[in-house]
Amino acid sequence: MKMDSAVSEEAFERLTAKLKARVGGEIYSSWFGRLKLDDISKSIVRLSVPTAFLRSWINNHYSELLTELWQEENPQILKVEVVVRGVSRVVRSAAPAETCDNAEAKPAVTPREKMVFPVGQSFGGQSLGEKRGSAVVAESAAATDAVLGSPLDPRYTFDTFVDGASNRVALAAARTIAEAGSSAVRFNPLFIHASVGLGKTHLLQAIAAAALQRQEKARVVYLTAEYFMWRFATAIRDNNALSFKEQLRDIDLLVIDDMQFLQGKSIQHEFCHLLNTLLDSAKQVVVAADRAPSELESLDVRVRSRLQGGVALEVAAPDYEMRLEMLRRRLASAQCEDASLDIGEEILAHVARTVTGSGRELEGAFNQLLFRQSFEPNISIDRVDELLGHLTRAGEPKRIRIEEIQRIVARHYNVSKQDLLSNRRTRTIVKPRQVAMYLAKMMTPRSLPEIGRRFGGRDHTTVLHAVRKIEDLVGADTKLAQELELLKRLINDQAA
């Protein structure tokens, strides 16, 4: 039974007074100052806040306290919900970063329907913190039937992907595959590798989504390696392995994410058969991992060989312009939920300059700003540095990746990165390889055995020989010394 509006407001006022007494004035103004009563119906109270961040924080830290206080007002209350004001509980599809999606929200999919899109945190789309159980309606029945594997996130599209020098080649290859359809196979298999938080999953899901959108009855499967292992183990347990394998072989496009997690001899054996079947049948395969195929030491050598037979592209860390664009898009998305939100361009630019890691670190920095902005609206750059010290690591050595050293050295000497990892012993390859090993030892905290593994599985004594060789030469070879200084500067600039 619905409470009278005046009675509801009186109850809410009493509750907020109790809440303020329990948590203190400062915490109350920080977290609950913009809390409003939306509705009291039957046994449920619905409260609202202006941002998803506030909603997530209150739900995670104060849900039990709110329920307890409401039950003191009305023992029939069983549940307190906190929602974002003016936003339907149905998740919107991703919209361009500069505009807000004002279209009427569609009803949520019921549990019986197939197309469910879990939502996490990302730039360029729906706001952070949406629960992974949320759902949107599939655009078509064909799309519903097509995705047989892991769920897709509707925000991960090519339109919401921030491109730049570090990922432009991988993005172009991904678009080509998505647009080619089943009639033409390109770069097969396409292997995209990068460290965590640099957009691999976004790119792979964008391929799957675009392929489904382009071709009405496309048979597209997007899987994480862990999900593949679970599905296959379940199929064996249920005596359904043959049917599962046949289902996967009868597709147009297979997209596999997080290949580094594919474990188990029998599982890898079955995946190898699947990979061979699809490639031999001219079916497109796209794979992503956190390292190059040659460095996936836990994978069966036959799987690695097949993956190396295609095109491998690396996605590097975003540069300053990309980081700034990510922050701008994230702010535009947040402003769709709270129009009063305002973070100055100079603050965004400063964060883009100082937080130089992955997109996830940038997301963490923005979340800090979003949180602080609710009770520090005029935050200064000095205060930003203080808040983000754990991300910027001011005064600490820059984090330099061996893969970046290899890429920059290979480009400088006009050889391929694969040449550096190969067994070729020509002079044009040996010198760049030794230089790259030397720089890896000088500029990273990695051990000699670890560096050796990153250079095609070489022994640590090979790395030690390379380091000593360059040290011996640099004293007498002015040109080499200048090359090393230039390379160090290029590597440091990339890490900046």
Swiss-Prot record:
| This protein's UniProt keywords | ATP-binding, Cytoplasm, DNA replication, DNA-binding, Lipid-binding, Nucleotide-binding
Report quaternary structure and partners: Oligomerizes as a right-handed, spiral filament on DNA at oriC.
UniProt-recorded name of the protein:
Chromosomal replication initiator protein DnaA
Q: Annotated region Domain IV, binds dsDNA: where?
A: 374-496
Q: Which gene encodes it?
A: dnaA
**One BP annotation, GO:** DNA replication initiation
Does the entry annotate any disulfide bonds, and if so which pairs? none
Q: Which Gene Ontology CC terms are recorded?
A: cytoplasm; plasma membrane
Q: Which InterPro entries match?
A: AAA+_ATPase (IPR003593), Chromosome_initiator_DnaA (IPR001957), Chromosome_initiator_DnaA-like (IPR020591), Chromosome_initiator_DnaA_CS (IPR018312), DnaA_C (IPR013159), DnaA_dom (IPR013317), DnaA_N_dom (IPR024633), DnaA_N_sf (IPR038454)
- Residues that bind ATP, according to the entry? G197, G199, K200, T201
Query: Which terms does the record give in the GO molecular function aspect?
Result: ATP binding; ATP hydrolysis activity; DNA replication origin binding; lipid binding
Note down the stretches annotated as region Domain III, AAA+ region: 151-373
Region annotation (Domain I, interacts with DnaA modulators) maps to 1-76
Family annotation (CDD domains): Bac_DnaA_C
Compartments where found: Cytoplasm
The cross-references to PANTHER family, in alphabetical order and at most eight, read: CHROMOSOMAL REPLICATION INITIATOR PROTEIN DNAA
Domain observations: Domain I is involved in oligomerization and binding regulators, domain II is flexibile and of varying length in different bacteria, domain III forms the AAA+ region, while domain IV binds dsDNA.
What biological function has been recorded for the protein in this entry?
Plays an essential role in the initiation and regulation of chromosomal replication. ATP-DnaA binds to the origin of replication (oriC) to initiate formation of the DNA replication initiation complex once per cell cycle. Binds the DnaA box (a 9 base pair repeat at the origin) and separates the double-stranded (ds)DNA. Forms a right-handed helical filament on oriC DNA; dsDNA binds to the exterior of the filament while single-stranded (ss)DNA is stabiized in the filament's interior.
